[in-house]
Regions:
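N-terminal Rossmann-like NAD(P) cofactor-binding subdomain of oxidoreductases
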Residues: 28-234, 272-273, 297, 323-332, ...
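Oxyanion-binding "anion nests"
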Residues: 229-278
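C-terminal active-site/capping subdomain that shapes the small-molecule cofactor and substrate pocket
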Residues: 270-372
Length: 372
């Protein structure tokens, strides 16, 4: 069950929706109540961004607790003028928390989220552990905030970062013309593989140094340091393999399956046809997607632009890039044009920050939606 504090707060507090960039002013219309918040994985890449966004958005916090693995337990983290001791998630007590944000991997979420939820908190989980559970809503607040009205397990799932980039774009187009097919190629940043992925790219670029130009005529000209995050060198390269291989007749990766299954659940289109190829690229932050979308009803490229120009979570841009989107909340969309293969088809190119809207921001927006 939800804590009494959270139930009372749901009635008494209203929240404004986010703007296009990280807000510089309070978004709360009322601060009659404040919440006890926890972050599991607080010292990690996404947990760090969560801490920043809670401050940027003036989330109503009474107290906050940080949890991490035993390696990070005992450290102190500065937050809004306070020094907060990091607790060991494995041995922590979970009483007197209202909302707990999880970003510590699927295994830990499977183990700890039910314990936290049974102690009275609402869990908002960033891992893949609960996304396809029929009793756990998978939520993008701009798309399906209504799903948070029923949370039988006190757990709400955050979608995969790649799926997230596309949802604010596809939902209004589906409402207009009825989405039928998606053909997607992704260009996923190294930060999607965690801090280790970012470090691996940085080390390989540094190793190449001034002789990187030698790769122009010989792809083996540089012996890169061995890496663990990607199956091939990522510097100056693209790797058409994200995640892990699923051993079935489709021979797809789990990243490709997530895009299909999560899109169907969030958009509530059970028969949506989705095929994807997920590619890792030498970018630090910002996932991009090349999408060909087929619709049940005719829709023009100009109509797509008109619709998306009115969506707060979307920015129209002639040439969307990861560099433009990094550190920014909305999805950048461009290269909008008719497709000549799919019936009623439209081509689009999207870029979005996989750490902000792709993970931390969406989790906090879910928390805000609970307070409406």
């Amino acid at each position: 069950m939800q804590s009494k504090r959270l139930k009372n707060f749901l009635v008494q507090t209203k929240i404004c929706s986010s703007g296009r960039k990280a807000p510089q002013r309070p978004i709360l219309m009322s601060t009659l109540k404040v919440m006890n918040i926890g972050i599991v994985g607080a010292t990690g890449q996404v947990g760090t961004v969560m801490r920043e966004i809670l401050t940027q958005r003036n989330f109503p916090i009474d107290s906050i607790r940080f949890f991490a693995s035993s390696r990070s337990a005992g450290k102190e983290i500065e937050f809004q003028g306070q020094s907060i001791l990091v607790e060991d998630a494995a041995t922590a007590k979970w009483e007197n928390l209202d909302i707990v944000l999880f970003s510590a991997g699927g295994q830990l979420s499977k183990e700890l989220a039910p314990k936290v939820a049974s102690a009275g908190a609402v869990v908002i989980d960033n891992s893949s552990a609960w996304r396809m559970d029929p009793d756990v809503p998978l939520v993008v607040p701009e798309v399906n905030a209504h799903a948070t009205k029923n949370i039988p397990k006190n757990i709400i799932a955050n979608p995969n970062c790649t799926t997230m980039v596309a949802m604010p774009v596809l939902k209004p187009l589906h409402q207009e013309a009825g989405l039928r097919d998606l053909i997607v190629s992704t260009y996923q940043a190294t930060s999607g593989a965690g801090l280790a992925g970012v470090q691996e790219l940085s080390e390989q670029v540094r190793e190449a140094g001034e002789i990187a130009i030698d790769l122009t005529h010989d792809g083996q000209a540089i012996e890169f340091p061995p890496g663990n995050s990607f199956p091939e060198p990522i510097a100056f390269n693209v790797v058409p393999f994200c995640g892990s291989l699923i051993e079935d007749e489709l021979e797809e990766t789990n990243e490709e399956r997530k895009l299909r299954d999560e899109s169907r659940k969030i958009l509530e289109i059970d028969d949506l046809a989705v095929t994807a190829t997920c590619v890792r690229v030498p970018v630090y932050t910002g996932h991009s997607l090349a999408i060909t979308a087929g619709f049940n009803n005719p829709i023009t490229a100009q109509r797509v632009k008109d619709i998306l120009s009115k969506v707060p979570a979307v920015v129209l841009d002639d040439i969307p890039t990861p560099l433009k989107s990094a550190g920014i909340d909305p999805t950048f969309v461009g290269r909008i044009r008719p497709d000549t293969v799919l019936e009623n088809g439209i081509n689009l190119f999207l870029s979005g920050d996989n750490l902000r809207k792709g993970a931390a921001l969406n989790a906090i927006q879910i928390a805000e939606s609970l307070l409406r």
